[in-house]
Amino acid sequence: MREPSAELIIDIDRIRNNIIYLKSLLKPDTKFMAILKANAYGHGLNIISKSIDDLVDGYGLVRLEEATSVRKYTSKKILLMQGVYSEDDFKIAYDNKFDLVVHNKNQLFAFENSDINIWLKVNTGMN
């Protein structure tokens, strides 16, 4: 019996066309952020982000390693959705000008004397 095989074909033109279409539905001054967590959902973080960089205003990433990888070739806004949990990670985020998601009051207080941009995660019961 043959092993089943799988093939993943990434059509960059379709991804780009989808972004262009979605943006056409928005007001012209609306910002558009690409969420590319988990290696762009398994499609290849660097391949996808380099291919759409001219179409997006920024990126939402989970892991610090992914964010630093994308920062190597873009100066656009990068939101580190996981946040940071150590002083070393905070320094990397600060030096790379990442925005951070704040998940709890301890993180909020830790960043209160910093000029780093933060986004507040507010859980309304839907996670």
Regions inferred by a protein language model and the residue ranges of each:
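Structured alpha-helical segments in the cores of large, soluble enzyme domains
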Residues: 18-25
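Active-site-proximal beta-alpha core segment in soluble small-molecule metabolic enzymes
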Residues: 2, 6-10, 14-17, 30-127
